[in-house]
């Protein structure tokens, strides 16, 4: 009981401290998935991280040369992008591992001593730490409308043999800043906006705490 109380107290103090910290904005350059990639939010978000770190490479180049793709049927988004991000009707999504590996393929091919990391499972305070102390933006998996996750009737089987439903409103955004109880995100469809910290935390956790950093 004492341990539970101590952990709750730490969380409360951390949240209160977050509401008091000054605003930190990283000034990530906005990139948009449309018109060329109506289902390419993940690679567009990665493109923003690449440009922030000084690599002048386009989302199209990253997608065409380094992003692993899978077919449309029973494909696992943990291993590759399902379908074609250039297509409105035949493009779905991928999770963090293929996006991190896409960047790492680019780094290896060009002898660049950088590493992209799949940070799936990172706490929301880990996301804040990346922004405030490391001064690095974070790609996170979110929803396209800021509403709770919704699912298609279709599913896939993961590497553990578990059947998982496919999201119908999955989206990818870049966390660009924090402060005063708000989180600044750059949406590849809508551009930059601020969302309430509690709302951001709730959706981030509902979407599996998926994240990529460089």
Language-model features: locations:
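Loop/turn elements at helix/coil->beta-strand transitions in domains of secreted/extracellular proteins
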Residues: 110-112, 134-139, 179-182, 209
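Short, solvent-exposed, low-complexity loop/linker segments
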Residues: 128-138, 142-150
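Extracytoplasmic
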Residues: 36, 134-135, 168-170
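Mid-length scaffold segments of soluble, non-membrane domains
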Residues: 87-126, 130-133
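Active-site-adjacent structural segments surrounding the nucleophilic cysteine of cysteine proteases
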Residues: 2-101, 144-146, 152-166
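Structural recognition of the beta-strand scaffold that forms the well-ordered cores
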Residues: 40, 137-142, 174, 184-186
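Noncatalytic regulatory segments and standalone regulatory/sensor domains
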Residues: 148, 152-167, 173-214
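Active-site-proximal beta-strand/loop segments in catalytic clefts of secreted hydrolases
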Residues: 46, 65, 119, 141-145, ...
């Amino acid at each position: 009981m004492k341990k539970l109380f101590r952990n709750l107290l730490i969380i409360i103090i951390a949240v209160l401290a977050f509401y008091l910290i000054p605003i930190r904005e990283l000034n990530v350059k906005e990139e948009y998935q449309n018109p060329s990639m109506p289902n390419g939010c993940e690679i567009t978000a990665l493109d923003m991280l690449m440009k922030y770190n000084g690599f002048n490479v386009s989302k199209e180049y990253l997608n065409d040369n380094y992003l692993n793709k899978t077919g449309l049927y029973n494909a696992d988004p943990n291993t590759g992008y399902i379908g074609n991000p250039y297509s409105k009707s035949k493009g779905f999504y991928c999770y963090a591992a293929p996006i991190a590996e896409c960047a790492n393929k680019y780094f290896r091919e060009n002898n660049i001593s950088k590493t992209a990391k799949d940070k799936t499972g990172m706490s929301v305070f880990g996301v804040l730490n990346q922004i405030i102390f490391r001064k690095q933006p974070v790609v996170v998996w979110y929803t396209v409308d800021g509403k709770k996750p919704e699912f298609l009737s279709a599913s896939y089987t993961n590497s553990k043999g578990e059947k998982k439903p496919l999201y119908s409103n999955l989206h990818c955004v870049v966390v660009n800043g924090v402060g005063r109880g708000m989180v600044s995100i750059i949406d590849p469809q809508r551009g930059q906006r601020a969302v309430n910290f509690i709302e951001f935390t709730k959706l981030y956790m509902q979407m599996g705490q998926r994240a990529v950093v460089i």
